[in-house]
């Protein structure tokens, strides 16, 4: 999607809005962490004789704390081979080369950004991998962005007719339809367009939603309406993805399934390192490299 020209100017209470958004992202992180640890406890199928995983949290600082920081929450368990649920709030100035790519940064390079990012790589190949993030960005303008997408790793499950994919799509369609400022058909198409490996001419997964540059429209409720939608995206994710995990995590799998999973993970690596805007943004703004690259799966294979 082509980047729009966003109105410039910040509301008088922008600092209050920043604080509210940051607090929400941290609350959502804690909610998802608890939800995923519950999934670890509930496993009764393969590997249920192993200890359930628990998140390990680690704080990090940008520019020795002068540019903000964040909290990494990582878990390696019997349901999730690797999952990261990270929050960050960073601020500073964009580099000259990066200013032209960010709305409102050409005239004034100062920025503030806060958000949550999650990527989960399950152990069981029957359970799809997933990504979700939501964020608020402030320059001389301000906006929200985010989305969620599903990546089944088995070819027989990587279809639009698969019940996991249909449940995932339906959850976000319902969420978008509750908010006049949201546009589900556009966000769904945007997701398909964004999460696409051009060099392989194939999608990364089976889609979801993706949105960016969501700027307040006072006729549709302004900042509050946008923020409420972003909150509901997080809530919808925390409802639908655990349902998908529970529907699959007790199933058996074969060595061939595991091999296919590892090859599909390779596509994940290719996308994140070649195309992902969040990865590029984090690396170019002095983000925490360990946190940024924690999205990569723990074990991968290329044929």
Swiss-Prot record:
Region (Important for dimerization): 268-303
Molecular-function GO terms, alphabetical: coproporphyrinogen oxidase activity; metal ion binding; protein homodimerization activity
Names of the cofactor(s): a divalent metal cation
Binding, a divalent metal cation: 121, 131, 169, 199
Major location (coarse): cytoplasm
PANTHER family from the UniProt entry: COPROPORPHYRINOGEN III OXIDASE, MITOCHONDRIAL, OXYGEN-DEPENDENT COPROPORPHYRINOGEN-III OXIDASE, MITOCHONDRIAL
Role according to the record: Involved in the heme biosynthesis. Catalyzes the aerobic oxidative decarboxylation of propionate groups of rings A and B of coproporphyrinogen-III to yield the vinyl groups in protoporphyrinogen-IX.
Protein name (Swiss-Prot/TrEMBL): Oxygen-dependent coproporphyrinogen-III oxidase
Gene: hemF
